[in-house]
């Protein structure tokens, strides 16, 4: 005789959620996004990854980490475009979220409310130490926030700040290793003071 057991009920309803991976430059944000997306693909989930079209540093069509790990992606100009590609998708990945418009917040909420797992990676602060683009609001609505850290190039402590090493005041300057360095709070404050003295 087989008894009905709730333990054997298989969950078939999709549960949406928002996961944010944030931190400074060179902290492994994109690396972690790629890892989570590849795990989802391995589990035969339908995935789609998006990045801002302006990010062509390593590849026009792929999301690429500073360590050269990559995964195929769709470059887009506007966050609203994400909804055009996600009707049959289980997991959505979004890299460099700080470069998207504020509409990304509603897009992510809409996807999660419709059962999609949304994984977002982005800088939480710009080179001035100011919260960057839609990232603060995305952290607020997220079900899970992972703050990742680089290592301070000056003292070896955990680094939360991205110091720009070239003179340029534009908020958006797509950076590679020569243009930014990760610093801890103390070394970052010292570097800002040195920058002011040079000006």
Swiss-Prot record:
ATP binds at residues 23-30, 95-98. GO terms for cellular component: cytosol. It is an enzyme of class 2 (transferase). It catalyses: thymidine + ATP = dTMP + ADP + H(+). The keyword ATP-binding applies. Its main location: cytoplasm. GO terms for biological process: DNA biosynthetic process; thymidine metabolic process. Homotetramer. This is Thymidine kinase.
